């Protein structure tokens, strides 16, 4: 495949990621508040957001199988069709004021996300080994566009029409249709038929792959990134509402948070190449610890903006670091099962944490939600330090 075609694919994946992330950030901005208004039991207010991660975790392995069977282009097109259904069901749930239908619509967005999680790996597959971390970073950087588009689309649409928020979720349909058009233009290389003996064809057992220290750190880094980020994003709109901030303030905070998540992606790949993946992961953990300190020391608007921006930075370093590390631990024939296991585990952890976020907030408040994250961060920090001390050199 020619170099121009390879990077054209990366650009198309960047655009389709931007469209999905716009829909995702819109939903993250609004679903906690919508859930709070619609749920009879306020402990379930964050259930719609938790259902996004349930949908993602449930789709990770099926999506991997589908992508391998019908190809990445057709598989990604199928994902956007699920996105259309997500917008339709969520919109209908709001029109009918049905909390459970609305939650199903959010779960379908998670299923769509199950396909989009493979965009970064498709980009890595499309370029030479030396450029993999840059390709991953670039696709994830699409969130910078979504950082502006998502919250502003939420602000613009939430009060349109007779039923608040209905048009916000209807816009997901339009975004998904646009994404369908973009991914239909992909020209991804077909899977290579791998040779001969049974061991080479099947690769190592998954159990053997996940015993690798790099696999453990890659998995732990991504899981920590998503659990901490998910808890922060899920509870921030509700916490700000509880502290008496204006109704449009959470959208601004989420916007800065998403900028923190995705803006560094333009240079994270280069930082990994210069300083090594272990140092980037270590820095990401320190940033998440700093987030907790800022979050629990005040509930003003500045605290929320600063804390959420920093948790975004930490997420970026941990997620891109973990993803880059993961691409080095599997052989080509082991790619699908390793990627699927990684993302299934990550989003299962995020789903569980998001499900309990509302109950944690109602019972222990904003500080309690954040302090409960400390043990996970400490464990990840210890593993990262051990890997750094072992002085394992990997060429990125």
Stretch-by-stretch model annotation:
Residues 1-7, 188-219:
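Juxtamembrane intracellular "pre-TM" segments in multi-pass secondary transporters
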Residues 18, 99-114, 303-317:
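Hydrophobic core of transmembrane alpha-helices in multi-pass small-molecule transporters
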Residues 31, 113-127, 317-330:
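Intracellular juxtamembrane helix-capping segments at the cytosolic ends
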Residues 59-72, 264-277, 361:
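Helix-to-loop junctions at the C-terminal end of transmembrane segments
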Residues 81-96, 287-299:
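C-terminal ends and interior cores of transmembrane alpha-helices
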Residues 96-101, 129, 138-184:
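Helix-loop-helix hairpin linking two adjacent transmembrane segments in secondary transporters
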Residues 103-141:
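Cytoplasmic helix-loop-helix junction between adjacent transmembrane helices
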Residues 173-195, 383-388:
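C-terminal membrane-cytosol helix-exit motif in multi-pass small-molecule transporters
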């Amino acid at each position: 495949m020619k170099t121009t075609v390879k990077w054209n694919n990366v650009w198309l994946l960047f655009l389709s990621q931007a469209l999905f992330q716009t829909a995702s950030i819109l939903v993250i901005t609004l679903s906690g508040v919508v859930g709070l208004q619609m749920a009879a039991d306020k402990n379930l207010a964050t259930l719609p957001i938790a259902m996004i991660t349930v949908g993602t975790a449930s789709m990770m392995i099926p999506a991997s199988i589908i992508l391998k069977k019908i190809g990445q282009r057709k598989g990604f097109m199928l994902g956007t069709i699920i996105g259309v259904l997500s917008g339709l069901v969520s919109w209908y749930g709001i029109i009918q004021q049905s909390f459970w239908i609305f939650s199903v619509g959010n779960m379908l967005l998670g299923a769509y996300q199950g396909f989009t999680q493979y965009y970064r790996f498709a980009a890595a597959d499309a370029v030479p080994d030396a450029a993999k971390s840059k390709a991953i970073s670039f696709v994830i950087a699409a969130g910078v566009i979504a950082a502006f588009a998502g919250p502003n689309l939420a602000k613009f649409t939430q009060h349109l029409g007779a039923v608040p928020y209905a048009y916000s979720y209807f816009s997901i349909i339009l975004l998904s249709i646009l994404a369908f058009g973009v991914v239909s233009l992909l020209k991804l290389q077909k899977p290579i038929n791998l040779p001969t003996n049974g061991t080479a064809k099947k690769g190592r057992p998954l159990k053997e792959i996940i015993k690798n220290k790099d696999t453990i750190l890659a998995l732990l880094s991504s899981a920590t990134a998503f659990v901490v980020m998910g808890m922060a994003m899920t509870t921030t709109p509700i916490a700000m509402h509880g502290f008496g901030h204006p109704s449009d303030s959470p959208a601004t905070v989420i916007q800065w948070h998403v900028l923190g998540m995705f803006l560094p992606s333009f240079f994270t790949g280069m930082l990994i190449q210069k300083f090594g993946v272990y140092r980037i992961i270590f820095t990401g953990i320190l940033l998440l610890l700093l987030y907790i300190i800022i979050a629990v020391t005040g509930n003003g608007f500045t605290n929320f903006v600063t804390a959420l921006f920093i948790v975004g930075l930490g997420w970026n370093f941990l997620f891109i670091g973990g993803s880059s590390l993961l691409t080095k631990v599997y052989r080509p024939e082991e790619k699908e099962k390793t990627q699927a296991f990684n993302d299934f585990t990550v989003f299962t952890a995020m789903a569980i944490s998001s499900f309990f976020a509302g109950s944690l907030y109602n019972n222990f408040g904003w500080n309690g939600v954040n302090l409960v994250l400390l043990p996970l961060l400490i464990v990840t920090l210890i593993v990262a330090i051990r890997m750094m001390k072992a002085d394992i050199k990997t060429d990125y």
